[in-house]
């Protein structure tokens, strides 16, 4: 799912490796994307592309199996973090515009951040984040449904080879 959704978006980083070989860190496999050039800034569309790609694994489960598993937990966490930063730190919120609603609390250790807003604003932030996640999820589902045959071909090839790298894609 990740590789196909990435490939169908014009500004996604190219996929360099896909594997279904489990790793000791708990990953059941992964899709590796490497940027073609070093990038220091991400546009709003770049961030949405990344979120769509992160949500594509769960979306593929829904399209293929009609169900959900816990396998996408880290992807969902990362997508939610990006969406939250869009709203609270990057000024990319429809509702709040260019307001800095969060600050980095410990930039030298874990990089966690805290909200600088009223409680009702925090609830509104959650709604904005949910909206971004829902739209990106729907976009990923649409791509996978449209290209279902290709999704099945990639999955079949992966089951046979276990790992696909650059030239094979």
Whereabouts are the PLM-identified features?
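Soluble catalytic regions of large protease machineries
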Residues: 3-169
